[in-house]
């Protein structure tokens, strides 16, 4: 299903960061990951155009994930395909960036579980919350 999209329908999703949930004895804890330098995260993805069973035209995309680098691994074993700005054109042209070293420095902090609520929206969802660790 995704082979054609991998070869011909790549996209970049610009983001300030992303969330991962760590399983702890207190339950799942959301962490916000972002570039240390504060720059944008260029996330590699694929897109598809298709028709639903009801006949609706749908445009969709999926983020690609790779094995987590050292900065992320403690929270989750996978992470989005994170590219440097100068790698974007090569990725869109079809280069396989999954084998590239993931040496981009990523910072993270715990955020409120409010991020899980679909009724919440806003920049405050990326604010750090106090923790004991």
Name each model feature, range by range.
Residues 1-133:
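A structured binding-face within diverse protein domains that lines the active/interaction site
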């Amino acid at each position: 299903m995704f082979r054609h999209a991998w070869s011909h329908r790549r996209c970049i999703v610009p983001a300030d960061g992303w969330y991962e949930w760590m399983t702890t004895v207190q339950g799942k804890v959301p962490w916000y990951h972002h570039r240390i330098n504060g720059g944008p995260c260029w996330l590699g993805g694929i897109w598809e155009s298709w028709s639903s069973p009801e006949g609706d035209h749908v445009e969709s995309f999926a983020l690609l994930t790779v094995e987590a680098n050292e900065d992320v691994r403690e929270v989750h074993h996978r992470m989005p395909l994170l590219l440097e700005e100068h790698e974007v054109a090569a990725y869109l042209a079809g280069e396989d960036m999954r084998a590239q070293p993931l040496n981009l420095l990523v910072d993270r902090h715990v955020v409120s579980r409010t991020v899980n609520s679909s009724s919440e929206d806003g920049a405050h969802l990326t604010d750090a919350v106090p923790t004991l660790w």
